[in-house]
């Protein structure tokens, strides 16, 4: 490790590794699952990443709002009629607006 670098807390390191496992296994599952599943797997991956930021103090109000909307989408009853394209377009715009607020070292 170089001077000035920080070590990730063990819990955060584990959670990031678990997110990577989720994304990899989701990619593998897409080879055999219906195509529509991909939308939800990618959406859930984004939700999980934003949840990590929330849990470890790295989020902003705008990012939390995106994660909360993703929670609503992911935990809604199956078969509910919704326009995922419009929802994801809106969330992408919200993410783009939120990115400048993120502090970088």
From Swiss-Prot:
Highest taxon listed in the record's lineage: Bacteria
InterPro entries per the UniProt record, alphabetical: DUF6092
Pfam families: DUF6092
Described function: Involved in the biosynthesis of albonoursin (cyclo[(alpha,beta-dehydro-Phe)-(alpha,beta-dehydro-Leu)]), an antibacterial peptide. AlbB is essential for cyclic dipeptide oxidase AlbA (CDO) activity.
Protein name: Protein AlbB
């Amino acid at each position: 490790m170089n001077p000035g670098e920080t070590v990730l807390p063990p819990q955060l390191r584990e959670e990031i590794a678990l997110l990577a496992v989720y994304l990899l296994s989701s990619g593998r599952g897409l080879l055999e699952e219906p195509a529509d599943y991909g939308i939800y797997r990618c959406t859930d991956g984004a939700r999980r990443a934003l949840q990590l930021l929330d849990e470890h103090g790295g989020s902003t109000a705008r990012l939390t709002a995106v994660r909360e909307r993703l929670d609503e989408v992911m935990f809604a009853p199956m078969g509910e009629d919704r326009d995922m394209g419009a929802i994801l377009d809106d969330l992408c715009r919200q993410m783009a607006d939120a990115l400048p607020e993120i502090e970088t070292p």
